[in-house]
Curated annotation (Swiss-Prot):
SUPFAM superfamilies: eIF1-like. InterPro entries: DENR/SUI1_TIF, SUI1, SUI1_arc_bac, SUI1_dom_sf. This is Uncharacterized protein YciH. GO terms for biological process: formation of translation preinitiation complex; regulation of translation; translation reinitiation. Residues 16-29 have a biased composition (Basic and acidic residues). It comes from the Bacteria. Residues 1-15 have a biased composition (Polar residues). Residues 1-29 are annotated as: Disordered. Belongs to the SUI1 family. Keywords: Protein biosynthesis, Translation regulation. PROSITE patterns: SUI1. One of its GO terms (molecular function) is mRNA binding. Coiled coil: none annotated.
């Protein structure tokens, strides 16, 4: 029944039959947290992107809130990547290393 020409002919159920939704799975990293500075598409304003943290969304949001408070700036969590406004790479690196994470500064 996975043929593209097949269709449901008769059903006693009413309404649409919904497909079960699957949660998006992030690819596993190599265990190293990378901090990258990005300005493209942001009108010259720089942000630090923190990738490679293997946590669920609730823990990432909690960690991002803590980093934003310590850095004194704004930020967001988008698709498993933490964005911190401004160039605070050195401060973020020291904070994450204090939590026992392996951190690398990626990019220039």
């Amino acid at each position: 029944m996975s043929d593209s020409n097949s269709r449901l002919v008769y059903s006693t159920q009413t309404g649409r039959i919904e497909e079960p939704k699957t949660a998006p799975v992030r690819p596993k990293g190599d265990g190293i947290v990378r901090i990258q500075r990005q300005t493209s598409g942001r009108k010259g304003k720089g942000v630090c992107l923190i990738t490679g943290i293997e946590m669920n969304d609730a823990e990432l949001t909690k960690l991002a809130a803590e980093l934003k408070k310590k850095c004194g700036c704004g930020g967001a969590v988008k698709e498993g990547i933490i964005e911190i406004q401004g160039d605070k790479r050195d401060l973020i690196k020291s904070l994450l290393e204090a939590k026992g994470m392996k951190v690398k500064l990626a990019g220039g």
